[in-house]
Amino acid sequence: MPVVFVAASKLPTPFATFTMNGFLEEATGREHVVLSLGDIADGAPVLGRVHSECLTGDALFSQRCDCGSQLEAAMRAIAREGRGVLLYLRQEGRGIGLMNKIRAYELQDGGADTVEANERLGFAADQRDYAICLPMLEHLGVSSLRLMTNNPRKVKALTEMGITVAERVPLHTGHNPHNKLYLATKASKLDHMMGNEHQGEVDRA
């Protein structure tokens, strides 16, 4: 899958000044961003996150999901480490796009859970494709990750494409009354490893 590097610039944030690397997915025209910090090409496992775009959670402070909180927590963790990488993939709504995501939310308002809503609209529960991660990581010289995720599918996908996942770092944050069913559904139907349901994992603020 052709993904080409376009340009890089500094991105000052409240957490750290990252390098913002821009990539173009030629087949779809989607523009992806990778934030990097420190020396990530030295061969040692890199603290990282693969984060799919969520306009409602990342930019509009929605409490229907935990996406915005996870994004902030990941950026803070990388800043504390002084070294890391965050892939921001333009795969809104687990790959169904923003307008279909709003349609799915409408169905959820009527009682459907997040998986049922996608399926009623004719989509798979999760349509994201992580193959685009490989050329971006290769460009940055990253071959091993300490991956911040609760999603075993991400671990499996990266491992199958030859990226070493040296450690899975749980990322439990952003729980609130509005997303209780959403998080429970991710655990029960999408096999996400959510907090107290798994011994030895500690919630992270």
From Swiss-Prot:
Keyword Transport: no
Enzymatic reactions: GTP + 4 H2O = 2,5-diamino-6-hydroxy-4-(5-phosphoribosylamino)-pyrimidine + formate + 2 phosphate + 3 H(+)
GO biological process, one term: riboflavin biosynthetic process
Cited Pfam families: GTP_cyclohydro2 (PF00925)
Pathway the protein contributes to: Cofactor biosynthesis; riboflavin biosynthesis; 5-amino-6-(D-ribitylamino)uracil from GTP: step 1/4
Binding site residues for Zn(2+): C54, C65, C67
Active site: D126, R128
Enzyme class: hydrolase
E.C. numbers: 3.5.4.25
Residues annotated as signal peptide: none
Entry note: cofactor: Binds 1 zinc ion per subunit.
Residues annotated as binding GTP: R49, V50, H51, S52, E53, Q70, E92, G93, R94, T114, T149, K154
One GO CC term on file: cytosol
Residues forming coiled coils: none
InterPro entries to which the protein is assigned, alphabetical: GTP_cyclohydro_II (IPR032677), RibA (IPR000926), RibA-like_sf (IPR036144)
Keyword Translocase: no
Cofactors, names only: Zn(2+)
Entry's Gene Ontology molecular function annotations: GTP binding; GTP cyclohydrolase II activity; zinc ion binding
Swiss-Prot/TrEMBL keywords: GTP-binding, Hydrolase, Metal-binding, Nucleotide-binding, Riboflavin biosynthesis, Zinc
Family: Belongs to the GTP cyclohydrolase II family.
Role played: Catalyzes the conversion of GTP to 2,5-diamino-6-ribosylamino-4(3H)-pyrimidinone 5'-phosphate (DARP), formate and pyrophosphate.
Entry protein name: GTP cyclohydrolase-2
Annotated organism of origin: Pseudomonas fluorescens (strain SBW25)
